[in-house]
Amino acid sequence: QFREFSLIKLIRNGGLSSGDVFERWIDRLLNGKTFKEMDYNLHVVATDVARGKPVIFNKETTPDVKVSLAVRFSMSIPLVFSFKKFGKHLMVDGSILSEDALHRDWAQDGTPVICFRLKGDYEYDEIKTNGMFPIVQYISLLIRTFMTTISREYINDAFWHNTIIINTGECSAVDFKMSNDQKYHLFKTGYDTAMKIIPIKTNTSTLAPAMFSPKSNSN
């Protein structure tokens, strides 16, 4: 439901999808909340490609910005979702910068920071690049290669202790046709990995299990 792919959008805005449907969906789930209205001290990291630096959204720096807009900036996979302007910034995916943009004392009280790295084992079928207009196929190849490289990127030794690898199996970040069963399995894999590894990384005995929807109700 978030695809809305269009070559016109790619040519005009730098991405196959505007991401507007996703932004409205998040905004609806959050009841239109801004950062200052959040109960938690939430931080969202995006990347300003014009300056090559991270941009951090939170209740101190951007109190009146909607959380949905910041999340929309942060999830902008290049070429898949359009660049979006924010003041003088040109915003894209927050994860394309180095890891040190994420590993910082966000709570300012020494609370440990845990980063989750998604790593897939998927093998893509060969894409044919013949025909009169092979641009779509070439873009698909570029996006897939980019996402595969990101998922297998080397983890700095300094951040290994605070990084948890979640094996997504054959699920890909650019697979927009996953079934409900695949989505549930992906969620369950992340949940089980976190429950198993976080106590080890943080030297705690165990975590209290969280409640989540049963498989039959997954969306």
Predicted feature locations:
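Patatin-like phospholipase
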Residues: 1-219
